[in-house]
Each structure stands twice: as C-alpha cells, then as structure tokens.
C-alpha cells in the first residue's frame, strides 16, 4: 500500500480539474484527431496520425499519474489550521539575514510545488528548516548552494 502524501485542498482541486479536462475535452479532441488522420489513408507514413497517437499516449499516461496522485493524497484543508508554529500548509514570510530580502513561501505537497508561485515542497531543505519554527525564530537552511540564514517574520494559513 502506498503511503499517504500530504496535499492542500487547493492542490487536490487543481489536480481533479486537470483530470476531468483530460478525460473529457482532451481525450475527445485527440480521438477526433486520430479519426481525421486515419481518413487520410496510409498510416505508415501519416505524420498526423503518429502525432495524434503520441498525444493520446501522453494524455493517458498523465491521467494514470493524476489518478495515482489523488488516490495516495492525504488532503489537508489548511483554512482550518491555526498554529503559531510552521506546519504543512503554512504561508511563511521570511527575511534573508544576509541580503535583508523578504520572501513568502507556501509549504505544500511535493506534487504542488512551484517555486515561481512561492510554493515549496514539504520535503525541500527550506521547508524542512522551517517546520516547527515560530515568528521571530531564525532558520538555518543547508542547501547545495551553501548554508543560508532566515528570520521568520509572519505565519499565516
């Protein structure tokens, strides 16, 4: 049995929406493209047919992956959390003690992580350094690029 993987309610909803779209809209579009390409005759040299079959393979693989992720997800409604300590689902504002630069990170599940959107994986060095800390605490993060020091400014959910 696969261990449960933490996931925010928002992340689970996004995966469900993608799964629904892939099973309905995308699947129908790809099947129509295959049918159209088949109508062009000889399949051995039909680039449109092979491209559509490749799309179908990718789409079905992604559907299987999404179903697996959702089946193993332990969905956590972070809006119900209220803690003075940093836990999964927290939005944490920190200041880099070296550069004085302020950043906000949302601690999410591995599948939801997106650094460009400020979402970091619960298993990342940054999140592991944050868990259990409170506002005002210092954090030491050991990463491949070296050790960094941050101060926790604010924790919200």
Curated annotation (Swiss-Prot):
Coiled coil regions, renumbered to chain: 9-30
InterPro entries (alphabetical): GreA/GreB_C_sf, TF_GreA/GreB_CS, Tscrpt_elong_fac_GreA, Tscrpt_elong_fac_GreA/B, Tscrpt_elong_fac_GreA/B_C, Tscrpt_elong_fac_GreA/B_fam, Tscrpt_elong_fac_GreA/B_N, Tscrpt_elong_fac_GreA/B_N_sf
GO biological process, one term: regulation of DNA-templated transcription elongation
Gene3D superfamilies tied to this protein: Transcription elongation factor, GreA/GreB, C-terminal domain, Transcription elongation factor, GreA/GreB, N-terminal domain
Record keywords, A-Z: Coiled coil, DNA-binding, Transcription, Transcription regulation
Superkingdom field: Bacteria
Molecular functions per Gene Ontology: DNA binding; RNA polymerase binding
Family: Belongs to the GreA/GreB family.
HAMAP family assigned: GreA_GreB
Record function comment: Necessary for efficient RNA polymerase transcription elongation past template-encoded arresting sites. The arresting sites in DNA have the property of trapping a certain fraction of elongating RNA polymerases that pass through, resulting in locked ternary complexes. Cleavage of the nascent transcript by cleavage factors such as GreA or GreB allows the resumption of elongation from the new 3'terminus. GreA releases sequences of 2 to 3 nucleotides.
Protein name in UniProt: Transcription elongation factor GreA
Phylogenetic lineage: Bacteria, Pseudomonadati, Pseudomonadota, Alphaproteobacteria, Magnetococcales
This protein's encoding gene: greA
């Amino acid at each position: 049995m696969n261990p449960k993987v933490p996931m925010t309610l928002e992340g689970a909803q996004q995966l469900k929406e993608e799964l629904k779209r892939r099973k309905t809209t995308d699947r129908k579009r790809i099947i129509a493209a295959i049918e159209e390409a088949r109508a062009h005759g000889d399949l051995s040299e039909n680039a449109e047919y092979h491209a559509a079959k490749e799309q179908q393979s990718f789409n079905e693989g992604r559907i299987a992956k999404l179903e697996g992720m959702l089946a193993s997800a332990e969905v956590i409604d972070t809006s119900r959390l209220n803690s003075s300590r940093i836990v999964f689902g927290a939005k944490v504002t920190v200041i880099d003690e070296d550069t004085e630069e302020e950043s906000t990170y949302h601690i999410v599940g591995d599948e939801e992580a997106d650094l460009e959107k400020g979402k970091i994986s619960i298993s990342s060095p940054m999140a592991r350094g944050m868990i259990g800390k409170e506002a005002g605490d210092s954090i030491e993060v050991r990463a491949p690029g070296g050790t960094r020091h941050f101060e926790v400014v604010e924790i919200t959910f």
